[in-house]
Amino acid sequence: MSLKVPCKFSLTSTNKSKSIQLFFKKVFTKSDGKKEGNIVSKLSFKLAKLIDGENVIGIEAKIKTKIVGYIFLTKLQYKEDYLVYWLAPVAVDNNFQKQGIGKKIIQFALKYLKKQKVDLLMTYGDPSYYTKSGFKKTNVSIIPAPYKLSQPIGWLVNKISSKRLKIKSKPKCVLPFRNKKLWWFNKSECGLICHKWNLFF
């Protein structure tokens, strides 16, 4: 289903941290249950408090005056000379899912990052959905992840610049993501690679 009402995208600010937390909690609780809703809402609150336009970037999607989506972009710091960001989490209002908002907000993010001379945008999610936004499967031997991945098939890259890749170091992620449980989980758990994220596109 395509979006009939125009959706506007813009950078968000740290003073919206509480409303951002409630937004993520509502979306994930409805789609994935209370436990996942609590995990992602706490994560989104911590990220929102750190928004500075450099290490943590927040982007919001709005229809008229209503917020319908949020994404976070956080810096992955490698020792090599590459400017790399990480995409997660992503959420679209449950009443506006499957209308292309998730894809469009990611496209907005990619255009913004290109202007900032960013080289790569990484994510850890379902390839069948993120490939719709230009992401491609990669390997941790080519682009190392911050922690060991339980689902390495979900380690995805979107090359923004034409710079040749040669990365050997393990990246340092922002503080809220320094938790190996967010990267390694059982099949019965949702984690960052939750299959229900297709609802956002």
Residue ranges of predicted features:
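A short beta-loop-alpha structural element at the N-terminal edge
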Residues: 6-22
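Short alpha-helical functional segments enriched in proximate histidine and acidic residues
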Residues: 27, 112, 129
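Conserved active-site alpha-helix within GNAT-family acetyltransferase domains
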Residues: 115-119, 125-150
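C-terminal "cap" of GNAT-fold acetyltransferases
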Residues: 145-194, 200
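A short, internal acetyl-CoA/4′-phosphopantetheine-binding micro-motif in the GNAT/acyltransferase core
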Residues: 89-97
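Active-site rim helix/loop that mediates acceptor-substrate recognition in acyltransferases
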Residues: 17, 21-64, 68, 72
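Conserved acetyl-CoA pyrophosphate-binding loop and the N-cap/start of the following alpha-helix
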Residues: 96, 100-108, 118
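A short, polar/charged loop-to-alpha-helix boundary motif
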Residues: 77-84
